[in-house]
Amino acid sequence: MAFQLDFGATLADEIVGGREERAQIADVAVERHRCTVVAFVGLAFEARIAAGPGVHVVCRTAGSELETVAETAVRRGYRGMISFGVAGGLAAHLRAGDWVVASAIHDSHGAHSNRSTDVVWSRRLLSLIGRAVHAPIVGVDTPVAEPAKKRELHRATGAAAVDMESHLMARVAAEHKLAFAAVRVVVDPAHREVPPAALLNMRPDGRADTRAVMRDIIARPSQLSPLARIAMDAFAARSQMLRVRRLLGPSFGFADA
């Protein structure tokens, strides 16, 4: 899921292709396109990919206050909020690089805390991506790294994927009567266990704390092989994010929904 992919995807981003999106994370607007949607992400590399015409990107950091973001969005006339980035797979058939467009958002308490997504916008996302699963996504507040816990969460919620942002944004969007959608790419499949070092890497600004990861690898070198697998999965997920972001175009397809 998003927190888990922090290590692998950020590693892939920095080593393989980070030069493509070194632009500063900021209010992103191109002169010809008024910002119409807020894209909420959890990681710095996701923010770089999400940036584009018609999009105000917010990276979830220690200082990110969603209520303030939503109030600003309403005041500036934004019309939608989208949760974009990586997720952990819960459905057994999903592999790294597979897409999930949320039909609803649950939280870890189960389906009774269900929040709907915008039907028209979600259909537009499905059409633009071309190959994606339309299913619930569950949001959690703490990492879900073990396959057994992923299976348990899937049974409890019926969700196909899990992240740590969508449930927060869905709640705020509903409170402020903004259209909401979520589109996430799987990085760690349901069968993949995420090693402890992969959970240590994030700094408050959403970037990788490589030193913390390396210290943990030195202390527990048996993690090296699992981390290599995560990095390969993350590369597949990141490649898909770059491809799909181009397909979604200005405002993540919202203007055409």
Where are these regions (language model features)?
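N-terminal hydrophobic/helix-forming segments and targeting peptides
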Residues: 2-21, 26-29
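Glycine-rich phosphate- or other oxyanion-binding loops that anchor nucleotides, phosphorylated ligands
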Residues: 3-8, 32-257
